[in-house]
Amino acid sequence: FKKKNKFLGKKFDLIIDLQKVVLRTLNLKKVPHKSFFSTCTNFIFSDYKNDKDFIFKGIYIERFYFNILSLIANNYFEKIPNIKIPKNKLSENIINTDKDTNIAIAPGAGNRIRQWDFQKYLEIAKDLREKGFNIYFFLGPQEQEYLNLCLENNFLCPEWKDGKMISNNITFTMKLAEKMKCLLCNDGGTAWMFEFAGVKTLKIFGVTDEKKFSRPGYCQTIQVNDYGIKEIKDFPVEEYKKNLDKFFETV
């Protein structure tokens, strides 16, 4: 921590440290503050102690943050509240098919090493369409490369029109999500939008932690490492279909 930096002359009411390396925690604690929260080395640097024995390792990430809030507020938040999604007019007339037959697929993720092969998702989509489902592909800006392929195979991409995204407002996607029966996805941002919109997901994991990034009650997971597979892209379609059949029993 150097005196000539952006924190000079500032003092924070509260700093919440999410570092896992002691040296970084020590540097962060040098920033002027009134109170400092840190789980590092069993709360040794923290002004707040874990006298309630809350769990902070190996848990769902949202529970992790609410446990932090519980200690700071000295009030345990047992139930994690749902989000009330405001109206979004742009989303109102895009999807008019029966929700019980609508299945969404989100083939993207922030990094390709977290993505199941797109062609495999396309194969799953074709199979589900033959069974009478309406398939909608949810593509973010980074998945624009799949847009034409989806359209050529007569699959709708409700977030897009004339080669451009209709809106980048998160409520737009979440309102569209509410019209879906479920979502098939990787561990990416779209999955979170669906889960917080109250839609169940079948989420495939490779390098990320399925326990940490799966919303309880809204997410069924596939961890490819459990099948002896190192890279998510190599997970076989037939094995995915078996998991999908089990997932459909829950939605």
Model-derived features: where do they sit?
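Catalytic machinery of carbohydrate-active enzymes
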Residues: 1-251
